[in-house]
Structures are given as C-alpha cells and as structure tokens.
Amino acid sequence: PTSEMSFDDCPVPEQNIIVAPWMLGGSGEGGGGDKAAQAYFDFMQRLNGIRAGMGLISVGIAQAAVDASIKYAKERIQFGKPLGSFQMVQEMIADMLTDTWSARLLTYRAIWLGGQGVKNRMETSLAKGFATEAALRVTSKAIQIHGAMGLSEEYPVERYFRDARMLTMPDGTTQIMKLIVGREVLGMRAYT
C-alpha cells in the first residue's frame, strides 16, 4: 500500500538518512541537509514524470479502444443494419471520446508544466488518476460494444481492458492521486 508518514522535530543521524546513491550523484556515502532535500525533490520530480507517463499510456490504450470500437460499429451488422446506427452505441462512443480527449488534455498540460520547470505535482496526479480511470471506462464500453466477442482474444479490446486496469495501481492508486490533489488544493493532509 502507498501511504505517507511525516516526523517533526525528529533528529536522524546522517548515517541513517535513506537516500539512494543515484539521487546524490555520488557513491552514496551518507548525505543530509540540503543535499538530501534536493535528492528528494529530484526523486519526486521523476515520480511526477512517471505518473504523467502512466497518463500517456492510458490515453493510448483508450484511443486504441475507441478506434477498435468505431471500426467494429461500422462493420458489424445487427438486425440488418450497422451496429453503429443504434443510439446507445453512438452514445457510448461519444462518452468514450469525451473521456479520451479529457485525459489527453489533462496529461498534456501536466507534461507541459513539467517541461516549463513549473511545480506540477497536482497536475500529474490529476492526469494519472483521471487518465487511468478513463481508460478503464473506455475499454469497458469497448467490450460492451463488441458484445461477447469483446471478451475473446479475437479482438484486442479484452487486452486493452486488462492493461487499463493494471495502470490504476502502480506509482500511486487513484485514491492516492485524489489525496495528493486534495492536499495540494487545500494545503492540508487528510490524515495525520
């Protein structure tokens, strides 16, 4: 599980400060003070980049599911007409596009801010949290559009769904992303 702990006014001997050697740019022989703080900041920036990357992967999965669903809805004939001519299929595709485009814009903004050197912890958390859940919703609708065939390996949407589900967990679950956003916006922790 991912969680946060903080210690105030708790002295830590230099030899007990945990900072990876690669974060210090040296052999890892101790570290502390400003050097450890900079290493922590650098690590968090990398984590923000990873979270934005998870958002990008999720957008790619969602877009692939949209594309597969549009293709299937145009080609599949049901009751003598294309599946895409049914109102609910069109509504699902509209919802899928809304989620995909929203996730794309949130993720691009988080990445752009990071590239400008602007603090983007909230934006990367929004992007990762929203994009991974959006990909899950989109791929679920893709399976529904494909019907029972959506669960078979004959169509790629079953794999997209599995991949989307997996992305909601690493580098902070959706719930953790929401806690980070809440803390960034309100300036207070949800737990002590």
Role assignments for model-derived ranges:
Residues 16-23, 33:
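Cytochrome P450 core scaffold surrounding the K-helix E-X-X-R motif
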Residues 1-11, 17:
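Flexible, small-/acidic-enriched active-site or ligand-binding loops
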Residues 6, 25, 30, 34-192:
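Alpha-helical interface subdomain recognition
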